[in-house]
Design a protein with these regions (language model features):
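Short, well-ordered alpha-helical segments
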Residues: 4-38
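A cross-kingdom feature marking charged/low-complexity
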Residues: 41, 46-69
Length: 69
């Protein structure tokens, strides 16, 4: 019986709408070249602000797991 083998890649994504949108955008982009995505782990979240303190961009770094072979 063959065991499933996974691979993990790390990606970064950003959005002007929020963290959830940044996650969705990152997964959508990576799914164009990677098949069999099984999950993602968000390991860092940050924001960019304007001079007056308003959030202008939400950023995430995530590890995406997918099956190979």
């Amino acid at each position: 019986m063959a065991a499933d083998v996974g691979k993990v890649i790390e990606i970064s994504a950003a959005s002007s709408k929020g963290f959830e949108d940044a996650i969705q955008a990152g997964l959508k982009k990576v799914s164009k070249t990677v098949r069999h995505i099984k999950g993602a782990w968000i390991n860092d979240m940050s924001v960019v602000t304007s001079d007056d303190g308003k959030v202008t961009e939400w950023r995430v770094n995530m590890k995406v797991t997918f099956l190979i072979g």
